[in-house]
From Swiss-Prot:
The lineage of its organism: Bacteria, Pseudomonadati, Pseudomonadota, Gammaproteobacteria, Enterobacterales. GO terms for molecular function: DNA binding; DNA-directed RNA polymerase activity; ribonucleoside binding. Gene3D superfamilies: 2.40.50.100, 2.40.50.150, 3.90.1100.10, 6.10.140.1670, DNA-directed RNA polymerase, beta subunit, external 1 domain, DNA-directed RNA polymerase, subunit 2, domain 6, RNA polymerase alpha subunit dimerisation domain, RNA polymerase Rpb2, domain 2. GO terms for cellular component: DNA-directed RNA polymerase complex. Transmembrane segments: none annotated. CDD domains: RNA_pol_B_RPB2 (cd00653). This is DNA-directed RNA polymerase subunit beta. Belongs to the RNA polymerase beta chain family. DNA-dependent RNA polymerase catalyzes the transcription of DNA into RNA using the four ribonucleoside triphosphates as substrates. It comes from Klebsiella pneumoniae (strain 342).
Length: 1342
């Protein structure tokens, strides 16, 4: 493998055996591709905005004299970039401009004569844009649109599994689900009649819909039944014989023909009998006359002479009827063929219960069901039925729906109309009847072939279409109002409904979620989340067990591990690592093609439907070097079951062992040794890890760390190769390689880094460069680390030296004992940034004012404010300190004469304002790191705002001019090269000032042209600089667009440093979570023979019952990795020669049987080897991929190489007494995370505070500054003790006895420590509730 210069800094030893056939795909593509499809101009008009416009336009007036046509659209440039939007609290969006054409036709002239055409570009609101990382900035906060897993449109056949009716009879049903429009359900009732429902309303006999489609009873019977023909010859009854139909029947008479008896009466008719009848070519047999009684006529029989209807279709025949028919000359009688086994008489029975008999009555019946209470007219009934399923405006199956529909009915073509046809409805009924007759299977609705993914683009398009449809109505009205000659397209279109629909979706849809920004992994997982909830999806309460369960088709598509615990379990899933969606929105997963028993590197993506037809081998099947399977029998999956197949039956093979799991689960080493429940907790808890002050790469990883760190977008990644020309904390400049430059550019890439910004979860986002000056860079190298990344690898926690042993009960019930050293070294110290805002509004009594002149506040409280009343940057503040001084005018109060006199003497006027300053919340303390002031247009800016503005302008100018200098330097170096090549002496150039170089002329024409080109670029560069500076200046100095009534907003950012402390929650990656019980002095911690103390002591009882053995293997492997690091460290300290180092590190990389990773240190220079060794001092990082990890033997080999005991256990000594512990203890290195459940955020105390309005009881929760609930069980406890007075106090004066509370206060002030409990307020509430039920209840005074 070839490593770039940056990758050589630290190479993770990989224990994976299976070759990596397919690279891990870009992890955010599900979001970015979907939105790209929405925004991109699509010439076919299949997707996105184009599809929405084409489906609504052209809009015609009611009269048809004019229409508004759509031509094209374009998206403008966003006003602010992403960072500016976040600071200002606005939406990152682009204006949508649509070119429309208004066509007016001549009224009197023939059809289609155009009178006038007007074309115009119309503004249609703002469309929020997706950032490069797959998020949206809505009102200044980053949000993610979660993809939805919903039932695919199409037709589904299902049964109630015998649960509806008490008899346990299985009732079958079919449901046609369109993408938009009414649902159509067919269902059997317990009497086997077929019914239809539209939109889950009242059910009607299914034949009504056929009559509404203009079928007569005869035609209906003709569609669904085969015929049995009887003929009357010589007063005998002959039946046309179709031998197949007799199979399984019992003969009710002798079956004979040509004097030969084929079946005797009472015998079962078998296949042998049928073969004989067919062989002798028997076409007719004679039947007794009684046999026809009970058969059903298949058509109307009319007496030719009188025209009287003797026997209508679907009537049961009797002997009398037969005689009548015979008399009127009907010798040939057709009846319906039915039997109890596989040709049920369902439709015939349904026709009998059908009250209608022609098209009109059927339409009226449907109208009554859909619009109860409205008087039906013929036109209304016809148009309602037409619009239900046969109008493109109201009904659309969509391409997916049509494809699923046709596949389900086994048709050949998969494309077709989006509306239903007569044939569609009839075929669905036929298939449903076939299933009832025992032919065919019902569908599995949890199969991923029947559920599809709706991503951002599609949902945004649907919302946009909703907005357009609202506009359409208004446009139709306007077009019909007349006076079109003066109107232009923009007078027709009101953009409000469109932007309202889009805004509503992005702002408040259930699937538009506040991004989880705890760490890079939580961001990526949130964007790859798949929810079954949301509009058009399931609800938590209704979702049963089956929907939530893992389905065989989830394999490689949806992760079976990562899902929340609690009410949403199984409804919210995560996309597997390699999964992607196909054009129809179904999930696909990649497989390697197997041809003639040889596994190729050809990759095919299969959806769940296609996968069912193949035999698929697992990724860990053993192959020889030619790609043949080694074993004769291979474990494979086929049709959702796993079993053994011979090697020549195999069609495909899994791509990778990680293919089953999601990104979160693929980061857990030794996942294969953990119980699934704990793995689920581990995957979920990694997302809650808080980024530590100094990120520390995991010693034991899975090799996915780099992919997650790079794809999450928190790191700065090189777009093009080159060398590092300049680097400081906030900017990296790369001089691009010649071969990667675009013609005619300066060849400089500038990366500006994010410094100390607040994330959605109040954690700190900060990027730090990890490259040095002059280093060569390749495309895709990581240039700067973000939060929780270390040298371009995800680093959520810290490597801790752990021991599994009890320690004085401090690790009882999963508690964690931590060494003081962890606190001293700031291993788990995190920075949290809080944003506090102060809003100055315009009130009825006058504007609020931000000022340092606050009434009744001492000097000390104002010491941290400047003259504008805003806190200084760098001030250390604690709870209750004033951050922004603000006063609000209050109404004039009536003053007493004395007060008036004092006022007159002292000129006091301070009492007409009250203090409404922004203060630091209780329990919070930190340092002010930034202040921002937003002022409304037209409001005078205060001194502080102007200072900030000045500073921003200076900074912007400095940034831009530095950028210009860098680009200029790059350009001039190229000019220099051209001039020297053109024959100008270097000495002469060095003496001339740079800007005079461009005036020199060259004799060589080609070189002169190049020089002129470069001169043009130089002018353009300067012009661009001026333009950019002006734009920046305008943005900084212009007023801000604030909400109505708001004059000023001051935002103060506090940085809080949180050290680890007892009560904080920590966890490993295997679901092993616990709370810190004690921080122990270093000298008391258990230590080994060398005196190295452990950092963390964990309870060994947490392992066996939880069955997460992965943590033990991780501990052993971590120990080995550290041991090798220690040996490298010792060699570096002794300054041994590079050859020895190279040899030892090479041994470590080569260890392990047939591993796929090949590291050849001979290709490294000495300097590179030394730098690699420097980075391996703290331990050699190791990758053990999921399901393909290090074996026990390999861990032992690695331990041996590090001179450590292969048991993984060492003798420890008690730090307090120095005595040796009784038996060896498992000690090693485990990766521990600090979770975002910090005791500081949860600790809370109250003595008095706010009370609930109705019950007058204290509120609950920290946010409301509430009390602790003394609940039912606590009351029982006091009752059991007999502590009557304590109980009385709890339930009255300490809770909701309003008078008692105030009396108590007075008593305490007076020094009288007694209480007088009264009536609790909640008792009055109870009385009122009883009275509201109409029961009078009165309390009698004694």
């Amino acid at each position: 493998m070839v490593y770039s210069y940056t990758e050589k800094k630290r190479i993770r030893k990989d224990f994976g055996k299976r070759p990596q056939v397919l690279d891990i795909p870009y992890l955010l593509s599900i979001q970015l591709d979907s939105f790209q499809k929405f925004i991109e101009q699509d010439p076919e008009g299949q997707y996105g905005l184009e599809a929405a416009f084409r489906s609504v336009f052209p809009i015609q007036s009611y009269s048809g004299n004019s229409e508004l046509q759509y031509v094209s659209y374009r998206l403008g440039e966003p006003v602010f970039d992403v960072k500016e939007c976040q600071i200002r609290g606005v939406t990152y969006s682009a204006p949508l401009r649509v070119k429309l054409r208004l066509v007016i036709y001549e009224r009197e002239a023939p059809e289609g004569t155009v009178k006038d055409i007007k074309e115009q570009e119309v503004y249609m609101g703002e469309i929020p844009l997706m950032t490069d990382n797959g998020t949206f900035v809505i009102n200044g906060t980053e949000r993610v649109i979660v993809s939805q897993l919903h039932r695919s449109p199409g037709v589904f056949f299902d049964s109630d599994k015998g649960k509806t009716h008490s008899s346990g009879k299985v009732l079958y049903n079919a449901r046609i689900i369109p993408y938009r429009g009414s649902w159509l359900d067919f269902e059997f009732d317990p009497k086997d009649n077929l019914f239809v429902r539209i939109d889950r309303r009242r059910k009607l006999p299914a034949t009504i819909i056929l009559r509404a489609l203009n079928y007569t009873t005869e035609q209906i019977l003709d569609l669904f039944f085969e015929k049995v023909v009887f003929e009357i010859r010589d007063n005998k009854l002959q039946m046309e014989l179709v031998p197949e139909r007799l199979r399984g029947e019992t003969a009710s008479f002798d079956i004979e023909a040509n004097g030969k008896v084929y079946v005797e009466k009472g015998r079962r008719i078998t296949a042998r009998h049928i073969r004989q009848l067919e062989k002798d070519d028997i076409k007719h047999i004679e039947v007794p006359v009684e046999y026809i009684a009970g058969k059903v006529a298949s058509k109307d029989y009319i007496d030719e002479a009188t025209g009287e209807l003797i026997c209508p279709a679907n009537m049961e025949l009797s002997l009398d009827l037969l005689a009548k028919l015979s008399q009127s000359g009907h010798k040939r009688i057709e009846t319906l063929f039915t039997n109890d086994l596989d040709h049920g008489p369902y439709i015939s029975e349904t026709v009998r219960v059908d009250p209608t008999n022609d098209r009109l009555s059927a339409l009226v019946e449907i109208y009554r069901m859909m619009r109860p209470g409205e008087p039906p007219t013929r036109e209304a009934a016809e148009s309602l039925f037409e619009n239900l399923f046969f109008s493109e405006d109201r009904y659309d199956l969509s391409a997916v729906g049509r494809m699923k529909f046709n596949r389900s009915l086994l048709r050949d073509e998969i494309e077709g109309s989006g509306i239903l046809s007569k044939d569609d409805i009839i075929e669905v009924m036929k298939k449903l009847i076939d299933i009832r007759n025992g032919k065919g299977e019902v569908d599995d609705i949890d199969h991923l072939g029947n559920r599809r993914i709706r991503s951002v683009g599609e949902m945004a398009e649907n919302q946009f279409r909703v907005g357009l449809v609202r506009v359409e109505r208004a446009v139709k009205e306007r077009l019909s109002l007349g006076d079109l000659d003066t109107l232009m397209p923009q007078d027709m279109i009101n953009a409000k409904p469109i932007s309202a629909a889009v805004k509503e979706f992005f702002g408040s849809s259930q699937l538009s979620q506040f991004m989880d920004q705890n760490n890079p992994l939580s961001e990526i997982t949130h964007k790859r989340r798949i929810s079954a909830l949301g509009p058009g999806g399931l609800t938590r309460e209704r979702a049963g067990f089956e929907v939530r369960d893992v389905h065989p088709t989830h394999y490689g598509r949806v992760c079976p591990i990562e899902t929340p615990e609690g009410p949403n379990i199984g409804l919210i899933n995560s996309l597997s690592v390699y999964a992607q969606t196909n054009e129809y929105g179904f999930l696909e997963t990649p497989y390697r093609k197997v041809t003639d028993g040889v596994v190729t590197d050809e990759i095919h993506y299969l959806s769940a439907i296609e996968e069912g037809n193949y035999v698929i081998a697992q990724a860990n099947s053993n192959l020889d070097e030619n790609g043949h399977f080694v074993e004769d029998l291979v474990t494979c999956r086929s049709k959702g079951e796993s079993s053994l197949f011979s090697r020549d039956q195999v069609d495909y093979m899994d791509v990778s062992t990680q293919q089953v799991v999601s990104v979160g689960a693929s980061l857990i080493p030794f996942l294969e040794h953990d119980d699934a429940n704990r793995a689920l907790m581990g995957a979920n808890m990694q997302r809650q890890a808080v980024p530590t002050l100094r990120a520390d790469k995991p010693l034991v990883g899975t090799g996915m760390e780099r992919a997650v760190a790079v794809d999450s977008g928190v790191t700065a990644v090189a777009k093009r190769g080159g060398t590092v020309q300049y680097v400081d904390a906030s900017r990296i400049v790369i001089k691009v390689n010649e071969d990667e430059m675009y013609p005619g550019e300066a060849g400089i890439d500038i990366y500006n880094l994010t410094k100390y910004t607040r994330s959605n979860q109040n954690t700190c986002i900060n990027q730090m460069p990890c490259v040095s000056l002059g280093e060569p860079i390749e495309r895709g190298d990581v240039l700067a680390d973000g939060p929780s990344t270390d040298l371009g690898e995800l680093a959520l926690g810290q490597n801790m030296r752990v021991a599994f042993m009890p320690w004085n009960g401090y690790n009882f019930e999963d508690s964690i004992l931590v060494s003081e050293r962890v606190v001293q070294e700031d291993r788990f110290t995190t920075i949290h940034i809080q944003e506090l805002a102060c809003v100055s509004r315009d009130t009825k009594l006058g504007p609020e004012e931000i000022t340092a002149d606050i009434p009744n506040v001492g000097e000390a409280a104002l010491s941290k404010l400047d003259e504008s009343g805003i806190v200084y940057i760098g001030a250390e503040v604690t709870g209750g300190d004033i951050l922004v001084g603000k006063v609000t005018p209050k109404g004039e109060t009536q003053l007493t004469p004395e007060e008036k006199l004092l006022r007159a003497i002292f000129g006091e006027k301070a009492s007409d304002v009250k203090d409404s300053s922004l203060r630091v919340p209780n329990g919070v303390s930190g340092t002010v790191i930034d202040v921002q002031v937003f002022t409304r247009d037209g409001v005078e800016k205060d001194k502080r705002a102007l200072e900030i503005e000045e500073m921003q302008l200076k900074q912007a100018k400095k940034d831009l001019s530095e950028e210009l200098q860098i680009l200029e330097a790059g350009l001039f170096s190229r000019i220099y090269a051209v001039l020297v090549a053109g024959g100008v002496e270097a000495d002469k150039l060095d003496k001339l000032p740079r800007d005079r170089w461009l005036e020199l002329g060259l004799t060589d024409e080609e070189k002169q042209n190049q020089l002129e080109q470069l001169a043009e670029q130089y002018d353009e560069l300067k012009h661009e600089f001026e333009k950019k500076l002006e734009a920046k200046r305008r943005k900084i100095t212009q007023g801000d667009d604030l909400a109505p009534g708001v004059l000023k907003i001051v935002k103060v950012y506090l940085a809080v440093k949180r050290r680890i402390q007892p009560g904080d929650k920590m966890a490993g990656r295997h679901g092993n979570k616990g709370v810190i019980s004690k921080i122990n002095p270093i000298e008391d911690m258990p230590h080994d023979a060398n005196g190295t103390p452990v950092d963390i002591v964990l309870n060994p009882l947490g392992v066996p019952s939880r069955m997460n053995i992965g943590q033990i293997l991780e501990t052993h492997l971590g120990m080995a990795a550290k041991g090798i690091g220690d040996k490298i460290n010792a060699m570096l300290k002794q300054q041994q020669e590079v050859a020895k180092l190279r040899e030892f590190i090479q041994r470590a990389y080569d260890l392990g049987a047939d591993v796929r990773q090949k590291v050849d240190l001979n290709t490294f220079s000495d300097e590179e080897v030394l730098r690699l060794a420097e980075n391996l001092r703290k331990g050699m990082p190791i990758a053990t991929p999921v399901f393909d990890g290090a074996k026990e033997a390999e861990i032992k080999e690695l331990l041996q190489l590090g001179d450590l005991p292969t048991s993984g256990q060492i003798t420890l000594f008690d730090g307090r007494t120095g005595e040796q512990f009784e038996r060896p203890v498992t000690v090693g290195y485990m990766y521990m995370l600090k979770l975002n459940h910090l005791v500081d955020d949860k600790m809370h105390a109250r003595s008095t505070g706010s009370y609930s309005l109705v019950t007058q009881q204290p509120l609950g929760g920290k946010a409301q500054f509430g009390g602790q609930r003394f609940g039912e069980m606590e009351v029982w406890a006091l009752e059991a003790y007999g502590a009557a007075y304590t109980l009385q106090e709890m339930l009255t004066v300490k809770s909701d006895d309003v008078n008692g509370r105030t009396k108590m206060y007075k008593n305490i002030v007076d020094g009288n420590h007694q209480m007088e409990p009264g009536m609790p307020e909640s008792f009055n509430v109870l009385l009122k509730e009883i009275r509201s039920l109409g029961i009078n209840i009165e309390l009698e005074d004694e």
